[in-house]
A protein has these predicted regions:
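Structural signal for short hydrophobic segments within the conserved structured cores
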Residues: 480-484, 540, 545-548
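The conserved cystathionine-beta-synthase
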Residues: 484-501, 508, 527-530, 534, ...
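Short hydrophobic beta-strand motif reused across regulatory alpha/beta modules
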Residues: 515-523, 582-589
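ATP/adenylate-binding site constellation spanning eukaryotic-like Ser/Thr protein kinases
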Residues: 209, 431, 478, 520, ...
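Alpha-helical transmembrane segments and immediately membrane-proximal extracytoplasmic
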Residues: 1-470, 474-475, 479-480, 484-505, ...
């Protein structure tokens, strides 16, 4: 009883504050204030997540010898995934996987509404997974967390649909800006990946969130960079062919990553009713890979740093420490290649068996190793002019981010801001463009948008498609119709027509299944001929509808049917053919115009 009273008291205080805000602070001003709060809270969430990961890893691996492998690598990931699955099953009780896809889905179909637990659940779950060695990234969970913070603040302050999308975008951009200390990358990530349109009205709140998150991350975590890089070999024009080829290689690696990830997800989906089988199967795959290739442990950023800081094979060879390859410098290229091509299996096994994490970091790691792999092979076999391995490691990361996310600006600015390698802008652009052109031949959507695009639930920059995505067919279905039976005499049909408010009457059987339709405009020439009343029944006068809409049909398909038939109304039926209502062309276009106006408004 006390808990209920306390909850009602808190709710009342919030309600009074919201009423006060509506009276004294404009929604525009409140949006800017919330943008600052979102940036602050996103940086706090990032700090806690990385704190959880660091403390768990320190606890588990502090006694390891850096030059030898350890059998505990076989055990840690399985323990972490098991603990994560227990946390999700008994505490969260909801699906929190595919963080960025979940944000896109909320924007497209749920009025940007995310559940309250998303403000913290992904932080804890992914912290446990990564800390115990799960081969996934923390970025997607943080993006989901930041977006959920923005969404829930928007719900509390009763913001309209467009402002809700903006606040979700603020949370996502703040998350990326805070994680990488890269405000511009956070801004363009929201534009390219979440596909939030940037007008002058929305630019300022997102910038505020990005800058706030970056500043507080510096306060919480210091000014150290995620990657240690010093440019010693500036870009030269004669390396352009190698950059183009690297971009093509990154595009193909992106395709490999996306297709393999999708295949692995399907494999684990077949075991959804056998959670312990998933845990054992995925855990064994992951732990075996980490045991053989320790660079797959956790996020893997430390391994990339070894490649960036090294100047020769002896220094680069440190990436093989704690593995069976340790001390065998001649196997470096083989080791790098194995990590490049097996990281996707480690990531899929982590998430598929019950872990929680994203594909952002794996994309960076695969890109870094792929870039080094390409450059090392190029130099060893003297394919052309010398290319610096460190530079190509960075460019590989940008290329994979571009290919996997279809986000060239994110790839360029993220790597430039992360490393301070602004002098590499030209080769970064060449690699990213080549990567995007290559992956676009095979996939038209990013790894996050692919699933939603197939279901027609993806909000894009294309205003027409975006409007159709935002339209809810259920809200368009009209129930105001006058049904009749097929054996009704024409004499009584005239009486039924006089009671109807529409130009049509659906003909139904006893179960409500649609048999046909009486179009009043088509029988007007005989309707007043009383001598025909006893000679005709409804089943002789009814017509088949020009098209029928399924109740789960996508709005773009509905619009195509209206265009093909030129009908004023079309019936909506369920899987058994039972009539659920009608959709009017006039109402569809009216709602469509309102949504387009909202999207286009500054």
């Amino acid at each position: 009883m006390m808990d209920e009273e306390l909850s009602e008291y808190k709710q009342g205080r919030i309600e009074r504050f919201v009423v006060w805000q509506k009276e004294h602070i404009s929604d525009r001003q409140m949006t800017l204030i919330l943008a600052f709060v979102i940036g602050l809270l996103a940086s706090v969430a990032d700090f806690f997540l990385h704190g959880i990961v660091h403390e768990i890893q320190l606890l588990l691996t502090s006694g390891f010898q850096q030059s030898s492998y350890n059998l505990l690598f076989l055990l840690f990931p399985i323990i972490g995934i098991y603990l994560t699955s227990l946390f999700i099953k008994y505490v969260v009780r909801d699906n929190i996987s595919h963080g960025i896809t979940r944000v896109l889905y909320a924007i497209s179909t749920k009025n940007s509404r995310l559940k309250g637990h998303n403000c913290w659940s992904s932080v804890v779950a992914s912290g446990i997974t990564i800390g115990f060695g799960g081969s996934v990234g923390a970025e997607a969970p943080i993006v989901l967390t930041g977006s959920a913070i923005g969404s829930n603040l928007g719900q509390i302050f009763r913001m309209d649909k467009k402002t809700m999308i903006l606040l979700v975008g603020c949370g996502a951009s703040a998350a990326i800006a805070g994680v990488f200390k890269a405000p511009i990358a956070g801004l363009v990530f929201t534009l390219e990946v979440l596909m939030v349109d940037l007008s002058m009205a929305s630019l300022l709140p997102i910038l505020i969130s990005c800058v706030t998150a970056t500043c507080f991350t510096y306060i919480f975590m210091g000014d150290s960079s995620l990657f240690d890089f010093t440019l010693t070999n500036p870009w030269e024009l004669n390396r352009t062919p190698a950059c183009i080829l690297l971009g093509i290689f990154c595009g193909l690696m992106s395709l490999y990553f996306m297709r393999t990830m999708s295949w692995c997800e399907g494999l684990f989906a077949k075991m959804k009713n056998h959670p312990y089988c998933k845990l054992v199967f995925g855990g064994l795959i992951l732990s075996s890979l980490i045991f053989l290739l320790p660079s797959l442990y956790g996020e893997g950023y430390s391994a990339v740093n070894v490649l960036l800081k090294g100047q020769n094979e002896a220094e680069w060879g440190q990436v093989m420490n704690r593995s069976l390859f340790s001390g065998h410098q001649n196997l470096l290229i083989l080791y790098i290649g194995l990590v490049t091509f097996t990281k996707v299996f480690a990531t899929s096994a982590t998430n598929g068996s019950g872990g929680c994490g994203g594909t952002f970091a794996p994309s960076l790691i695969i890109g870094g190793f792929a870039g080094f792999f390409f450059a090392r092979l190029w130099n060893v076999y003297e394919v052309g002019v010398y290319v610096p391995e460190q530079n190509f490691t960075l460019m590989g990361m940008a290329g994979l981010i571009t290919g996997v996310m279809h986000a060239p600006l994110t790839g360029i600015f993220l790597i430039a801001e992360l490393t301070g390698g602004y002098q590499l802008f030209m080769p970064l652009m060449i690699v990213c463009i080549s990567s995007l052109l290559t992956i676009s031949i095979f996939e038209s959507h990013s790894i996050y948008a692919l699933r939603l695009a197939r279901e027609g639930k993806l909000l894009t920059h294309h205003i027409d498609r975006a409007a159709l995505t935002l339209m809810s067919m259920q809200s368009l279905v009209e129930k105001d119709y006058h049904p009749i039976k097929e054996d009704l005499p024409m004499e009584k049909l005239v009486s039924e027509i006089s009671r109807s408010n529409n130009n049509f009457l659906p003909v139904l059987d006893e179960a409500g299944v649609l048999l046909g339709v009486i179009d009043i405009t088509k029988i007007r020439h005989i309707i007043f001929r009383t001598e025909l009343y006893k000679h005709f029944k409804v089943k002789q006068l009814m017509l088949q509808p020009s098209a029928v809409i399924s109740e789960n049909e996508r709005m773009d398909e509905v619009m195509q049917k209206f265009d093909k038939t030129d009908a004023a109304q079309l019936p909506v039926v369920d899987i058994n053919g039972v009539l659920k209502g009608y959709i009017s062309r006039t109402k569809v276009y009216e709602v469509y115009r309102h949504i387009v106006a909202d999207i286009s408004a500054e």
